[in-house]
Amino acid sequence: MQPNDITFFQRFQDDILAGRKTITIRDESESHFKTGDVLRVGRFEDDGYFCTIEVTATSTITLETLTEKHAEQENMTLTELIKVIADIYPGQTQFYVIEFKCL
């Protein structure tokens, strides 16, 4: 069994599979992904594989520079997105946007 390259909370699985979530915002520990990378995706909770994605773009961002477009790509409101990122990465301000598509 191959290991997963990246994981998402289970609550995001349906949005990823339906194409409603097309970016993920990560901290420095996951800043190594590059455009063109093909990644096996698993659920954070049980590491169960659920799809393969291709990275289509990467960029850096701060909490203060998040926009409505980022929120739309995450399938949530900007207020929700800022709260989710702050809850997952407390005290951090520099992040990495990974844009992707399901294969």
UniProtKB/Swiss-Prot annotation:
Q: Which family does it belong to?
A: Belongs to the N(4)-acetylcytidine amidohydrolase family.
Protein's name in the database: N(4)-acetylcytidine amidohydrolase
Where does the ASCH domain lie? 6-101
Q: Which SMART domains match?
A: ASCH
**What's this chain's function?**
Catalyzes the hydrolysis of N(4)-acetylcytidine (ac4C).
According to its record, what are the GO cellular component terms?
Answer: cytosol
Give the range the annotation lists for the signal sequence: none
Q: What class of enzyme is it?
A: hydrolase
- Enzyme Commission number: 3.5.1.135
Q: Which GO terms describe its molecular function?
A: hydrolase activity, acting on carbon-nitrogen (but not peptide) bonds, in linear amidines; N4-acetylcytidine amidohydrolase activity
Under the heading Pfam families, the entry gives: ASCH
Q: Does the keyword rRNA-binding apply?
A: no
Q: Which domain of life is it from?
A: Bacteria
